[in-house]
Amino acid sequence: MRKIIHIDMDCYFAAVEMRDFPEYRGKPLAVGGSRERRGVISTCSYEARKFGVRSAMATSYAFKLCPNLILVPGRMQVYKEVSLHIREIFSRYTPLIEPLSLDEAYLDVSECQQYKGSATLIAEAIRRDILAETGLTASAGIAPVKFLAKVASDLNKPNGQYVITPEMLPEFVKTLSLRKIPGVGKVTAEKLTSLGLNTCGDVQVYSKQELLSRFGKLGAVLIERAHGIDGRGISIDRERKSVGVETTLAKDIYTLEQCQQVMPGLIQELALRLSRSAKDRKIHKQVVKLKFSDFKQTTIEHRTEEVSVNLFYDLLTQALARQDARGIRLVGISVGLADSTLYVASTLNTQTQLDLAL
């Protein structure tokens, strides 16, 4: 049986700000984009959460819920530096580290000999080191499999940890909500509920053939997770799957021409990001995303092995066909990265310059 720890920093961006600026402590604080530029909340303090403020919420709505909210723009470079320090702490206990983002990671400590191999004590030690060296608190989940470690890390927040032992696993998963399983979003959860499936226990006694017929690959995953099975190991060389850029507009726009005026800046920024982080990666698709005034969004993608500026404009036109008279508040573009090594950024740079020169 493996010993997996999921470490999740507590309201990370906001916590860094409160550490560096003590005047923010104990107050409702959020990191995110401004109301004037129609930004969204990246994260917020627990004091702000008491008012209902949440990540990914429109900043304007957050202020309606909490008029005294303190909003700061964020300092990404600082967050990255602290994250590297935290990752160095992880490496003292195991080389098997899978970062999920700046503020969370999986660790496999199955072979760790410290603390007599106790994953519970190792997690406590990691959290102590993080607090002592960075001034930040972390929560942890410990379990024999990845998805349950992630679930567990959320059960004793903030600054706590929760252990699911192999002996606890069968009973724990029976009552676990299907919404906690990665890959089960709002729409899928509603479909499952319509079938009378709300917990892993419900799936355990449901027809496997019916699940596979209705949900395909996700059905197979549901069957495994409902029985506490997750064969995924720690991916220490986890590759980036995509590179993208998007902009939230100061005011809603409505026409194709207005959207097209946004594109050159996005394309230039995408070219820059590709050259920095994926210059030796081959692409397999291009994507355009629009978010409308009702906060619903649509994406259009096309499989391709060569970046084409013209294709981005074609996809934009297709996406706009789904507008239904709604205003557009966000435009985004991205490329999906394949697992090969062909230089792609210079192509985009060249095409971008040609397009902008026309």
UniProtKB/Swiss-Prot annotation:
Per the UniProt record, the site (Substrate discrimination) maps to 13
Q: What Enzyme Commission number does this protein have? A: 2.7.7.7
Q: Which residues form the active site?
A: 104
Query: How many cofactors are bound and how?
Result: Binds 2 magnesium ions per subunit.
Transferase keyword on record: yes
Domain called UmuC: residue spans: 4-185
Q: Which family does it belong to?
A: Belongs to the DNA polymerase type-Y family.
NCBIfam families attached here?
PRK02406.1
Please give the name of this protein: DNA polymerase IV
Source organism per UniProt: Shewanella sp. (strain W3-18-1)
Taxonomic lineage of this organism?
A: Bacteria, Pseudomonadati, Pseudomonadota, Gammaproteobacteria, Alteromonadales
